[in-house]
């Protein structure tokens, strides 16, 4: 029987190779983590986020069965289904990922995972579980997996590229020369995301780099990885859920004000984080992205400070009507309605006056209105697709803030 113990390896800041930093063991559904002695004695060691550098089992935050910084390195729905299909032989994505343990996902997922951690069977020998694959192979593997078709041996390497990253839709990691990408495969949502990223950048949002490309007669969205430097250097990275000591079960309790508090107290630039976060919320509302849950926010961790990552996974998915809510509340009293007027009323939370907040919102709305045609062209959207998005983004509801009093 395979031991329910795995060793955690980490890439320290600036390091090109990993070192063992600790061990994780599963006992009755709870995962205990201990730093290794060699890591604690290493003068260059940095703490994993949320786990102080000290001997003994690190206590789990209330309600959690696995430290968030370790959970962030595991696959989400798509990657779990890929692993489930490989291990069980069942086709399609109808299986229940809960059939397999977190330890299994640690062991079976690719080493090219989110952030700068990996899981290994050995504390002394590191075995890289990531192979190269072409974009065409990745696309074909994703298509076959969605259909439930068996994969030929020639696509087995491509298969693994979908096992190490988060998200529910088909995607895979890709390396092109010295650059590292996440490939998102052909679907309407992929083009919608390209349009939203294009517009968000013109709103003044720091977004991930991205490009639309073609393979096998289909479009693929390539999103530049912010947890990798050019050449492959890895950055420790944590999700919003981890920053808030939450997991998926309790993710509904995540709020922007709580995230703001963490980034203010632990961030590298506390003076401007309120303004930056407010602009991102405004952009999400304008762009119809109501899927702004805590795992769709991240920060880079250097052992001392957090730095908000570029914005990613911006998806215009809100229904075109008025009654919509953001996944995370933006007000300290639970306000989450997808209206700009409601957001502006919460300006003091982000250390902004009403006038400053309204100016930011106006800039976001103007960016959409001024760049709509070029965004459609950039995202290669058809007339019918553009019409549907127009009802979501250029919706009368996004102008409601213009009737709010500017008295701040």
Task: Show the residue positions of the predicted features.
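Phosphate/dinucleotide-binding and metal-coordinating scaffold of catalytic cores
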Residues: 1-294, 298-408
